[in-house]
Amino acid sequence: RAAYDKKNRMPKQLASRRIGLLFDMNNYWEMEFQRQTDQWWTMPHIHKYYNLLKSFAAPVDVISEKEDFSGYPFLIAPAYQLLDNNLVERWTEYVKNGGHLILTCRTGQKDRNAKLWEAPLAAPIHQLAGINSLYYDHLPHSLYGKVDFGDEEYAWNNWADVLTPAAGTDVWAVYADQFYKGAASVIHRRLGKGTVTYIGTDTDDGKLEKEVVRRVYKEAGVPTEDLPYGVVKEWRDGFYIALNYTSDIQEIAIPDEAEMLIGSARLEP
């Protein structure tokens, strides 16, 4: 209590990582009703992105469309299948004004009534995300496809949006096999003062997704941490709190100038 100061504000470096994670129950219910494949689970898909963001020590707020997006340097909408043109316009303005938007597979494929658009698949987001066209594939349990991102190869078999990018859109990752070998898996474009990244592939281990999101932060000039999975570091009212939810002892880096009030850098389970 003696160390508390009501004037404390979130450190600038931490605030620069802040991200809003967009979630809607109607979207969740509809996708669980029509999963398309027994390997798709909506909530684990969302949790995967939440967990990788927490490993960056990024402040994550789970928000609804009612919130003002402009307060977040980064915004992610995982598998946001149900939307309308109004939401796409809000996303577009957010990006033009300097926000960094991340969309993932299955986003925008249906309207608010869960009807396919009378247009190409996910047509409302094409201009925003820099997509010319897309279709999707998913593989059986026993077969894994491959994606090349940077110098690494990643396995997938849950879901793949196969993307044809529009002119001016950068391709960050491509499918390394199947009949669409060489097609885009992850695309990225600049729009106004901000960026849009579309991650078309869903993997089991999330390693591809983690490296893509890490690059989004890096391209934006925002440093991230790399906490072990299951270790969470939070900030509130001037205090950092580190929690270890794993079964093993974990070590975290603590600045030399920090004052340790409770515990140590060695976190017991």
Residue ranges and their predicted role:
Residues R1-P269:
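Carbohydrate-binding surfaces of carbohydrate-active enzymes
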